[in-house]
Amino acid sequence: RRFAAAGWSLVLTGRRAERLHALADELCAQARILPLVVDVRDRVAMEQAIEHLPAEFSRLRGLINNAGLALGTAPAPECSLDDWETMVDTNIKGLLYSTRLLLPRLIAHGAGAGIVNLGSIAGNWPYPGSHVYGASKAFVRQFSLNLRCDLQGTGVRVTNLEPGLCESEFSLVRFAGDKAKYDSVYAGAQAIQPADIAETIFWILNQPAHININSLELMPVSQSWNNFAIERA
């Protein structure tokens, strides 16, 4: 919505067709919108979708890799391998597919183009139950830094955005739809809102072409790092 309001042409991707098309219908009065129903985990589907982008959407200035999820909070010995695979497939492989497939278009744009990868403070700071999710976001952080090295001289910028507590469907997915658990995460805390993340991404991609925001950690004032565990005898 933030980018559409500024007149950017947008390619929107998602798995839920009805919801995706509803958003496209909402935004089409403000900007050119192309909704693509695709699962980022499906390499072949991603290849086909990007190969067949209409000409009016072929010139790419920005890529926002925001598909990601966490599943469960159980300690590692109690976790489902299926959940671990889903997190790896989405948070790591999905991001790699979209990035590699769209890099030629970003490089062709040159100065001013940019990639924003949605990392997490979980990739920087460990906490119980984060295991694979946190590790996947640590991967995203390191990949973002390494990608910057490879793209030096192309004009393409790379940013790893690392949000903390954000009130979104993320926790509802993590708790398998348990609304009570979802509500407990945000109770009494003024969490970051998705619109705050969108505003930050908009700011990043609209920096002067000679400026790169390497990484940006974003937390609500109500959150800090003071919950370190100590085992006492």
Pin down the residues of each PLM region.
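Canonical Rossmann dinucleotide-binding motif of NAD(H)/NADP(H)-dependent dehydrogenases/reductases
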Residues: R1-L10
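Alpha-helical segment proximal to the catalytic Tyr-Lys
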Residues: P104, L145, C149-D150
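C-terminal helical subdomain
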Residues: N160-G164, K179-N227
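The beta1-alpha1 cofactor-binding region of Rossmann-like NAD(H)/NADP(H)-dependent oxidoreductases
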Residues: A17-E18, V37-A49, L81
